From Swiss-Prot:
Biological processes per GO annotation: hydrogen peroxide catabolic process
CDD domains per record: Hb-alpha-like
This protein's encoding gene: HBA
Positions of post-translational Phosphoserine modification: 3, 35, 49, 124, 131, 138
GO MF annotations in UniProt: haptoglobin binding; heme binding; metal ion binding; organic acid binding; oxygen binding; oxygen carrier activity; peroxidase activity
A Pfam family hit: Globin
Protein name: Hemoglobin subunit alpha
Keyword Heme in annotation: yes
Residues that coordinate or bind heme b: 87
SUPFAM superfamilies: Globin-like (SSF46458)
Residues recorded as bearing N6-succinyllysine in the entry: 7, 11, 16, 40
Gene Ontology cellular component annotations, sorted alphabetically: blood microparticle; haptoglobin-hemoglobin complex; hemoglobin complex
Assembly mode: Heterotetramer of two alpha chains and two beta chains.
Species this chain originates from: Didelphis virginiana (North American opossum)
């Protein structure tokens, strides 16, 4: 459960990402593909090179989903319900892949936010991304 301080930290960190959210999430996805090659199986016929149009497009989708979660911190299950259905029933993404992506989101944010990505922000973002992952995998039964 996110504390009031966590929510403040998450909103603040996401606001610092700002207009770079699509690019940063594309970079996080690219890092995920490099670090965990099995994640590529969900993206047939993709150009996996850095900055490809497909990675940019998917990065923006991820950024939009994260932004939606940030905007609905008090009711993420409702806000992300359709995405949860999509990933569980249609795409059938292995839940471990959310952990891989979340790790790389943290790495990417740390790389770009530098000193603004404090240990406290890191901890709050980690809790937030774990909560998003839990919501996205909640319909896997």
């Amino acid at each position: 459960v996110l504390s009031a301080n966590d929510k403040t930290n998450v909103k603040g960190a996401w606001s610092k990402v700002g207009g770079n959210s699509g690019a940063y999430m594309g970079e996080a996805l690219y890092r995920t593909f490099l670090s965990f090659p099995t994640t590529k199986t969900y993206f047939p016929n993709y150009d996996f090179s850095a900055g490809s149009a497909q990675i940019k497009t998917q990065g923006q989708k991820i950024a939009d989903a994260v932004g939606l979660a940030v905007a609905h911190l008090d009711d993420m299950p409702t806000a992300l319900s359709s995405l949860s259905d999509l990933h569980a029933h249609e795409l059938k993404v292995d839940p471990v892949n959310f952990k891989f992506l979340c790790h790389n989101v943290l790495v990417t944010m740390a790389a770009h936010l530098g000193k603004d990505f404090t240990p406290e922000i890191h901890a709050s973002m980690d809790k937030f991304l774990a909560s998003v992952s839990t919501v996205l995998t909640s319909k896997y039964r």
